UniProtKB/Swiss-Prot annotation:
Protein keywords: Cytoplasm, RNA-binding, Transcription, Transcription antitermination, Transcription regulation, Transcription termination
Gene Ontology terms for molecular function: DNA-binding transcription factor activity; nucleotide binding; RNA binding
Gene: nusA
Domain S1 motif: 135-200
Protein's UniProt name: Transcription termination/antitermination protein NusA
Pfam family, one: HHH_5
């Protein structure tokens, strides 16, 4: 039997190109499983094969635990240390037992286990082989085509899957076609595919530029981000680490040669190369190209920008089906609101009027005084109440410290009165504490929800985004986040 084990291990190792150690591990597992079947109760068996002679020893073992739940497999620490004081929790007590003689059933079990272990070893080998290739472009031959995906043969018994959503629109492949894509995921636990390739994600565009533009590989040019509408249009942001190099020109190439190669690989996808800037507003202006931006207003609190363009330039700025502004939003990470110059002026005039009326009513000011505060950029009572006094006295018309002190006192009193009114409104509406404590919720929004008869988490979870869009303080995205947070708690039990 020992000679048969050695011959079998050598044959399988050579056939599968796997280390002999892996084959012996599979054989040990197979013999252990066959041995367990000889017992009428649950046991833990370990088998050790001598790789030189093929002889094997069999051990029955007990796990050292605090509390025994399976007496046939576990032993307490106190009992284990009776024979070996050095044993610790998590270690094993072993007794050598008689090794089984292989009969037909035992041999069949061994073959099944060996086959499973070999498949696992082969899959582990593929994962190890391609782990360092993750994030890079790989090339394979189409092996199988289905409605939802294709399977690529990458060589050396390695296969990768490209899902339909990771292909370009209208992209069709046949068995035998050569395909390039980015290996974006290596999944060691995958039961079917372990390697996943994409042609539609931004990483594909980035890696193609790394290949076609040597200055990127030499780190003279840096890619700062990319956004794609796969197969149609893309934007990629670049910056130069060498003042002598024009990053946009280098990426375009002589007569557009470099970017054209990338466009051809991506089925005609048009690529805008955007100059990155550490000034967010300038970066957004660059990202909106080819549209000309007339003016831009940054809202740091909401991480958004209002972009104004001339009326005859609006369609180009937005793009077909919103494509240009959508890609610019993805590339920059800012929420971008595109409108005409007239619309922007009207919007901000309305906002100024709202703030003006707030100051007039809450602070009991005349319109002229309130207008001074608005023109100086104050937009809330909190800003007036807690800004350093010297900043207010530096404003023309507000040099008097007593006047400024009175102004700040009125602002603080107005804030306190508003807070008390909010608390009374919430108490009267019987708003649930869980709703008030929801992430992203504030008392003002809670009052607006209460006016809509939404006073509990369950009631909020039942709403749609359209039901909350008339609340001025909420954007559609913020409304969606609140609703989803409520659903996660009420429907899925995620506290």
């Amino acid at each position: 039997m020992s000679k048969e084990i050695l011959l079998a291990a050598e044959a399988v190792s050579n056939e599968k190109l796997l280390p002999r150690e892996k084959i012996f591990e599979a054989l040990e597992s197979a013999i252990a499983i066959s041995t367990k079947k000889k017992f009428e109760y649950e046991t833990d068996i370990r088998v050790s094969i001598n790789p030189k002679t093929g002889e094997f020893d069999t051990f029955r073992r007990w796990l050292v635990v605090d509390e025994v739940k399976v007496p046939t497999k576990e032993i307490t620490l106190e009992a284990a240390q009776f024979d070996d004081p050095n044993l610790q929790l998590g270690e094993y007590v072993e007794d050598q037992i008689e090794s089984i003689a292989f009969d037909r059933i035992a041999m069949q079990t061994a073959r099944q286990v060996i086959s499973t272990k070999i498949r696992e070893a082969e899959r582990a080998k593929v994962v190890e082989q391609f782990r360092e290739e993750e994030g890079k472009i790989v090339t394979g031959t189409v092996k199988k085509v289905s409605r939802d995906s294709i399977i690529l043969d990458l060589g050396n018994k390695a296969e990768a899957m490209i899902a339909r959503e990771d292909m370009l629109p209208r992209e069709n492949f046949r068995p035998g076609d050569r395909v390039r894509g980015v290996l974006y995921k290596v999944n060691p636990e995958g039961k079917t595919a372990q390697l996943f390739v994409t042609r539609s994600k931004p990483e594909m565009l980035i890696e193609l530029f790394r290949i076609e533009v040597p200055e990127i590989g030499e780190e003279m040019i840096e890619i700062r981000g990319a956004a794609r509408d796969a197969g149609s249009r893309a934007k990629i942001a670049v910056k130069s680490n060498d003042k002598r190099i024009d990053p946009v020109g280098a990426c375009v190439g002589m007569r557009g040669a470099r970017v054209q190669v990338i466009t051809n690989e991506l089925g005609g996808e048009r690529v805008d190369i955007v100059l990155w800037d550490d000034n967010p507003a300038q970066f957004v202006i660059n990202a909106m190209a080819p549209a000309d931006v007339s003016s831009i207003i940054v809202d740091e609190d909401n991480h958004s920008m209002d972009i104004a363009v001339e009326a005859d330039n609006l369609a180009q700025a937005i793009g077909r089906n919103g494509q240009n502004v959508r890609l610019a939003t993805q590339l920059t990470g800012w929420t971008l609101n595109v409108m005409t110059t007239d619309e922007l002026n009207a919007k901000h005039q309305a906002e100024d009027n709202k703030v003006l009326n707030l100051f007039i009513n809450a602070l009991e000011l005349d319109e002229e005084f309130a207008q001074i505060l608005v023109e100086e950029g104050f937009t809330s009572l909190e800003e007036i109440a807690y800004v350093p006094m010297n900043e207010l006295t530096a404003i023309d018309g507000l040099e008097d410290e007593d006047l400024v002190e009175e102004l700040q006192t009125r602002a603080k009193n107005a804030i306190t009165a508003a807070a008390v009114a909010e608390e009374e409104a919430l108490k009267k509406a019987n708003v649930e504490d869980r709703l008030l404590n929801l992430e992203g919720m504030n008392r003002h929004v809670a009052i607006k929800l209460a006016e809509k008869q939404i006073t509990t988490l369950e009631e909020l979870a039942e709403q749609g985004v359209d039901d909350l869009t008339d609340i001025e303080e909420l954007t559609a995205e913020q409304a969606a986040d609140l609703i989803m947070a409520a659903r996660n708690i009420c429907w899925f039990g995620e506290e």
